[in-house]
A protein has these predicted regions:
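Active-site rim/adjacent substrate-binding subdomains
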Residues: 1-92, 104, 111-113
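Short alpha-helical catalytic segment bearing the HExxH-like zincin motif
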Residues: 92-100
């Protein structure tokens, strides 16, 4: 495994945007009021992504309630672990986006893993 290359904020946001564009249209519509945020706080959260808010039609998930729903995709940890190979990085960004969308749709960790997300 080589050294991860630097990905600018714009380059990484383009990967996230592409992953969102690949979602089924019904999922894209469901996300209209969810903020999608690229962050470099993955190392402190020990994660590639995080959903904060209320599950669709449900109760707060991971401290939500009152704040707008937000999906965070962590550039620092994804680039650190997969940035040496653009194809692997892209695949893991797609997987992370889908995983966090699964949480928004109401699935817990076991549920998204069972779905292969």
């Amino acid at each position: 495994m080589g050294r991860p290359r630097h990905y600018s904020e714009q380059e990484f946001e383009a990967l996230v945007s592409s992953a969102l564009d690949e979602l089924p249209i019904e999922f894209q519509r469901a996300l209209e009021h969810v903020a999608i945020v690229v962050s470099d706080r993955g190392a402190e959260n020990h994660a590639y992504g995080m959903y904060v808010g209320s599950k669709l039609g449900g109760s707060p998930f991971f401290g939500g309630g009152g704040s707008p729903d937000e999906i965070m995709i962590f550039r620092d940890t994804l680039v650190r672990d997969f940035g040496d190979d653009p194809n692997r990085l892209r695949a893991h960004v797609v997987q992370t986006v889908r995983h966090e969308v699964g949480h928004y749709l109401g699935f817990d960790e076991a549920g998204v893993n069972k779905l292969g997300l």
